[in-house]
Structures are given as C-alpha cells and as structure tokens.
Amino acid sequence: FDDIDLDIVHHTGDKDISIGSHSNNGFVSKVIRYKGLAAHAAGAPHLGVNALNAASLGLSALAYQRETFRDDDHVRIHPIITKGGNLVNVVPDEVVIETLVRAANKDAIADAAAKTDRAFKAGAIAVGASCEVTTMPGYLPALSEKADASVLTAAEIAAQTSEKDYQIVQEDTHAYSGGSTDVGDVQHLQPVLTFNTGGKVSGLHSVDFDIVDEELAYVVTAKIFALSAYRLLR
C-alpha cells in the first residue's frame, strides 16, 4: 500500500445502492485442542479421559461468560466442533474446537479472548484432560465512513444510465454490524471509500442466496468503480 493514496471497496448489500459504511467488529481466531485418553467406551470408560466431555464443559463455561460482556462492545463468540472423536465405541481422546472472538474495539477483543481461553481450559481441568489454545490474528474493527461526494456522484450517474429505477441511500454511520472485514485493517492505514449494491435475494452465506439482478450486481457496480476512479483522478 506504500504507493496507494486511498482505496474504494464494495460489498453486496440489501439496498439497491448505498454509499458510505457503518462500523464492524474486529476479531481473533482460535483453535482449541483437547487431549484425553482413549479407552473402550462401554467396557472400560473409567480408564479413559473423555476429551469430548472436556470440550462440552468448556462450551458451557463460555456460555456463562455472556453476562460479563458489555452491550456497547458487541461481543460475538461462535465456536464449532470440527473434530468430536474417531469411533463411537472409543472414549474420545482428541477433540478440536474452532472459534472467532469478535468485538467492537481492541480492548474488548482482548478481554473476550482471555475469558474464552479461561473457559475452555476450565473444561479440561474438570475431567483431567489437557487443553492447548492457539490464537491467530484476524481483522481490526472497521470504522464508520460518511458517503464520499465523488462516489455518490458516480453512483447517481450509474443509476441514471440504467434502464431500471435504482434507489441510492447514504449509509447510516451510527449503525453497527457484528461481522468483520479485512477492510478494517486497511482503514487503520489509509482512507477507504465504500459502496454497496444489491441485486441479491436472501441473506449472505445462506443456502437460498442468489443473484437476481445481474445489471445491478455487476454492471452498475463496475460503472460506480470506474466513474469514482475517474472523478478522483481527474
């Protein structure tokens, strides 16, 4: 980014055309690996150490942290079990959980991450298993941004040259999303101008997601990119 002055970014949205952006959470990513001891699940369960039980207790402990998170910090923690055991008749000796820990600011991310580690390790201690937590960097919180005049004008021209009547709105900078984006990292380095276009049905990452207006999703979007660049460079 050393030779770049600013960036223009786009994402699929719910409105026809929206200019500007609201805030988003940042996050860190974690992999939690429980190690127990295999044994016959029916014949000799007392000889094993159940890593799945440790993980279940860890998930429960994490749930009890919920009341400690401030509403203003928009904390979101959503783990999944990616490995729960190998065979149904064997006490699980390895269980793996992956989770993202999201929040609105760096201090809140650090606080929620520490509570997450503590909760999962507590599950291991309870049943005599071991627990290894690996934390990886994610994204910084995204910043709200008012609609830029050049991008707004570009959107107006792109809409006027379309056969359909597309509505243009300016994004509510006081709104908030619990999701995260790598745009947050870039915003902490240099200016970022944002616009969204619709043309889809159903929610993102859902089985029913589909593009139903290709002109808006592709053509109008490309026009806004090109016209914005032209107006900013001229």
Pin down the residues of each PLM region.
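Metal-dependent amide/peptide-bond hydrolase catalytic core
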Residues: 56-234
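Histidine/acidic-residue-rich, glycine-tolerant segments that coordinate divalent metal ions
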Residues: 1-78, 83-90
